[in-house]
């Protein structure tokens, strides 16, 4: 059993990603950083004669069906349907109390053949007798644009100097480059020469190569943006010997580290119980979420 506070990672809206390295025999691979995509989780091995090897998610006794049935192998396909591949992406991490990972025969004895790949049981918070509390949790995560200085990469001038050396040694001749599947800047140059738009050895050719040498496009700035992801959660809990309840609302806003990848998620949760007698009690659990992505 895992306590949610030990699993939770700051700046991570989907708490299932925090299971990585938390339980022996459970393999968790985050194949994508995009919100809503499910991590690849293996509880009972990588293969199964029954086909699917994804574990079954159970929240407060309710089996969470996938909105889109995606196999573990297809999670890294990049298809848009993977954005709704996580069964619990709509849960507020602040509402979760614990995880219990079932790996052995107890999983199939309770949940049947669907649990052949293991079961992850999620227990949410409940009201407690004699406890009344209002709680607010806010998280702010700042992401910076990556810098080329953090990587051992050539700039445009370094790259062109390598190309020029290869050209002098005959590796980037017209016949070699023209027939290549990927030919880069020299392929574009020879295409212009072969079409008659540029003369071999002309000043125009020199200017063409010099322009490429000074280009230095910062692709990190083209693809990424500095952003602040923030989430807010308000919960109310109260209880007596007869009844108790826990209610919460939350909102998560992520402008997206990569451009055009913003996410907004809203959740609401109510867990109420009423003790009618020593032998009979009534429990109501409701949970809803809305996500725009």
Predicted features along the sequence, with ranges:
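Short, small/polar-rich motifs associated with maturation and membrane association
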Residues: 1-269, 274-291
């Amino acid at each position: 059993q895992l306590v949610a506070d030990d699993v939770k990672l700051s700046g991570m809206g989907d708490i299932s990603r925090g299971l990585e390295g938390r339980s022996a025999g459970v393999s968790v691979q985050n194949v994508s950083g995009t919100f809503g995509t499910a991590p690849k989780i293996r509880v009972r091995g990588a293969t199964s004669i029954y086909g699917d090897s994804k574990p079954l998610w159970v929240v407060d006794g309710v089996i969470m069906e996938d909105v889109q049935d995606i196999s573990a192998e297809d999670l890294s396909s990049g298809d848009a349907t993977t954005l709704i591949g996580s069964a619990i992406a709509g849960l507020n991490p602040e509402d979760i109390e614990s995880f219990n990972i079932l790996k052995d025969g107890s999983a199939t004895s309770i949940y049947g053949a669907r649990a052949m790949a293991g079961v992850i049981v999620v227990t949410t918070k409940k009201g407690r007798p004699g406890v009344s509390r209002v709680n607010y949790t806010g998280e702010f995560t700042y992401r910076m644009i990556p810098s080329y200085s953090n990587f051992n990469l050539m700039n445009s001038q370094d790259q062109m100097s390598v190309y020029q050396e290869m050209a002098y040694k005959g590796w980037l001749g017209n016949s070699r480059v023209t027939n290549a599947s990927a030919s880069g800047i020299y392929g574009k140059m020879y295409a212009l020469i072969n079409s008659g738009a540029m003369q071999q050895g002309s000043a125009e050719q020199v200017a063409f190569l010099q322009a490429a040498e000074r280009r230095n496009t910062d692709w990190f700035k083209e693809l990424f943006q500095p952003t602040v992801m923030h989430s807010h959660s308000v919960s109310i809990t109260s209880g007596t010997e007869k009844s108790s309840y826990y209610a919460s609302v939350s909102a998560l806003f992520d402008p997206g580290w990569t451009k055009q990848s913003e996410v907004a998620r809203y959740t609401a949760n109510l867990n109420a119980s009423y003790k009618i007698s020593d032998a009979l009690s009534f429990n109501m659990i409701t949970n809803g979420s809305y996500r725009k992505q």
